Amino acid sequence: MALNFPNIDPVIVKFGPFDIFGQTFEPALRWYGFTYLVGFVAAMWLLNRQADRSNGLWSREQVSDLLFYGFLGVILGGRIGYVLFYHFDYFLASPMYLFKISEGGMSFHGGLIGVITAMIYITWKQKRTFFAVADMVAPVVPIGLGAGRIGNFINGELWGRVTDVPWAMVFPSGGPEPRHPSQLYQFALEGVALFLLLYWFSKRTKKVGAVSGMFLLGYGIFRVIVETVRQPDAQLGLYWGLMTMGQILSVPMILFGLYLILRPEGKQ
């Protein structure tokens, strides 16, 4: 007996419609965007708290800079990565597809590349080492990841494969078959479990880059696990009949994460 997907309107409130220069606009606040906003505010609070306890190594102004450019990196990198990794054929046929944000579509791995680019800039601007910045950011990233997965669940998207487990759900866009609620698995692993793991690990190591390595390792492993029950992207399917794109992109994260954790102390 499958569970029914909760009928949650993805739109919290609509504004308008407004007529501007002959065009009708009806902006709306959606749960998906709201969950990311909550995650961003929570991450800002935690980073400011870390800055206050850093004995002068970080100021709140520097944290604000980090958050601003990090946010840009997530949005731009996430969208560009989604288009290039998962819908490159659409992009080749119509490059303007990149700007159709209203249709949805964000990639974690693209967002990660965007954040890394932002951190490189912050490294230069604030005259820090790259991993000093990365180790500051890594422990709060799971908050945004978890918030985003709740948004995916409310939208009824990114559901899992067909299953007969007792907690399987029938999703409105997933056909009549009961499926794994893989968004909730990702919330539990990439959000809650990874946050707790990084919090615990950050208290037990002072090695530069180790916390960043644990983030890469933990996320990569959790993503590979969940991808085994998450429905592969229809336009991509399985590579070699075995791996999803998400798993392929996670393998380098696992390997580099292991390197950062195990490399000799003091090696930059």
From Swiss-Prot:
Gene Ontology terms: cellular component: plasma membrane
Keywords, alphabetical: Cell inner membrane, Cell membrane, Membrane, Transferase, Transmembrane, Transmembrane helix
InterPro entries xrefs: Lgt (IPR001640)
GO molecular function, one term: phosphatidylglycerol-prolipoprotein diacylglyceryl transferase activity
Binding, a 1,2-diacyl-sn-glycero-3-phospho-(1'-sn-glycerol): R149
Pathway connected to this protein: Protein modification; lipoprotein biosynthesis (diacylglyceryl transfer)
Record-annotated membrane-spanning stretches: 27-47, 66-86, 104-124, 130-150, 181-201, 208-228, 242-262
Location in the cell: Cell inner membrane
EC number: 2.5.1.145
Membrane-topology annotation of the record: Multi-pass membrane protein
Class of the enzyme per the UniProt entry, highest EC level: transferase
GO biological process: lipoprotein biosynthetic process
Family: Belongs to the Lgt family.
PANTHER family per the UniProt record, alphabetical: PHOSPHATIDYLGLYCEROL--PROLIPOPROTEIN DIACYLGLYCERYL TRANSFERASE, PROLIPOPROTEIN DIACYLGLYCERYL TRANSFERASE
HAMAP family: Lgt
Role: Catalyzes the transfer of the diacylglyceryl group from phosphatidylglycerol to the sulfhydryl group of the N-terminal cysteine of a prolipoprotein, the first step in the formation of mature lipoproteins.
Protein name: Phosphatidylglycerol--prolipoprotein diacylglyceryl transferase
Taxonomic lineage: Bacteria, Pseudomonadati, Pseudomonadota, Gammaproteobacteria, Alteromonadales
